[in-house]
């Protein structure tokens, strides 16, 4: 894929960039694999905002993605590569030999017409899925399971890739895109290769309206609010926050403070925390 820039004729397009969508081969999704999802817009079942700065945005159809890759031993051919409005990665439509169709995350370098398979002893080729114990050291993978059979949860964003750095006993050591190094069972499955659309990280939004298309609302700074709305609020004119450190609207340390809970069961699996 590539990035397309606009000629600088308006403030909204001066620094804006978009994908050229050169890898997309089909415009309409597979109807049997799409359905409507009622978006929560940051509200819970009582209508109370639980996640701020969400709402609006363009309507979307959800594409059902196969994160489990559990059609063992049945080869599939890549039919199309499509755009998915629900993620920054592209998706690939697979036609299996038994007639079933499924979407997967599009791995970088996988083309229409390529054949892939999920198998215990599948060749270590881009797009194939197999257990971590059968992938050699240094191998690059994505869509990695945390629990065997639970479906891929790690390294699923555009351009994401995890690397196998060690194997010991029934555990495999992975270096994740965040910089975290953690242990995973060698029975967990993963897909070989890197997620496509690697230039997604280099996109420049360019204008506020484009964020609204994505369903993201303005993020108002606490320092410009009233004291009743935020701990940073109040004062005459432009005032400092008046505290030793920045805090959230609920008084919790923010802006750099680590928020992971201590003494979690998974701490023993994390060898090095994320950067």
Swiss-Prot record:
Region (Disordered) residue spans: 225-275
Localization, UniProt: Plastid, Chloroplast
A Pfam family matched in the record: Ribosomal_L2_C
Cellular compartments per GO CC: chloroplast; mitochondrial large ribosomal subunit
Protein name as it appears in the record: Large ribosomal subunit protein uL2c
Similarity field: Belongs to the universal ribosomal protein uL2 family.
PANTHER family in the cross-refs: LARGE RIBOSOMAL SUBUNIT PROTEIN UL2M (PTHR13691:SF5), RIBOSOMAL PROTEIN L2 (PTHR13691)
GO molecular function, one term: transferase activity
UniProt entry keywords in alphabetical sequence: Chloroplast, Plastid, Ribonucleoprotein, Ribosomal protein
Subunit (UniProt): Part of the 50S ribosomal subunit.
Gene Ontology biological process terms, A to Z: mitochondrial translation
Source organism, top-level taxon: Eukaryota
């Amino acid at each position: 894929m590539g990035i397309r820039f606009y000629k600088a004729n308006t403030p909204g397009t001066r620094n804006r960039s978009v994908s050229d969508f050169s890898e997309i081969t089909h415009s309409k999704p597979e109807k049997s694999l799409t359905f409507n999802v009622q978006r929560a817009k940051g509200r819970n079942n009582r209508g109370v905002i639980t996640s701020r700065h969400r709402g609006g945005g363009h309507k979307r159809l959800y594409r059902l993605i196969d994160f489990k890759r559990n059609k063992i031993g049945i080869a599939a051919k890549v039919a199309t590569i499509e755009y998915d409005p629900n993620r920054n990665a592209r998706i690939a439509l697979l036609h299996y030999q038994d007639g079933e169709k499924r979407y997967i995350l599009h791995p970088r370098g996988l083309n229409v017409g390529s054949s892939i398979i999920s198998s215990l002893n599948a060749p270590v080729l881009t797009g194939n899925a197999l257990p971590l114990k059968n992938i050699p050291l240094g191998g690059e993978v994505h869509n990695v399971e945390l629990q065997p059979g639970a479906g891929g949860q790690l390294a699923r964003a555009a351009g994401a890739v995890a690397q196998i750095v060690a194997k010991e006993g029934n555990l495999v050591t992975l270096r994740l895109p965040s910089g975290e190094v953690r242990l995973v069972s060698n029975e967990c499955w993963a897909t070989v290769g890197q997620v496509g659309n690697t230039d997604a990280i280099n996109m420049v939004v360019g204008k506020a309206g484009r964020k609204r298309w994505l369903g993201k609302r303005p993020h108002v700074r606490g320092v410009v609010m009233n004291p009743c709305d935020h701990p940073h609020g109040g004062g005459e004119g432009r005032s400092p926050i008046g505290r030793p450190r920045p805090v959230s609207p609920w008084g919790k340390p923010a802006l750099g403070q680590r928020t992971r809970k201590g003494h979690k069961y998974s701490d023993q699996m994390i060898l090095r925390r994320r950067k």
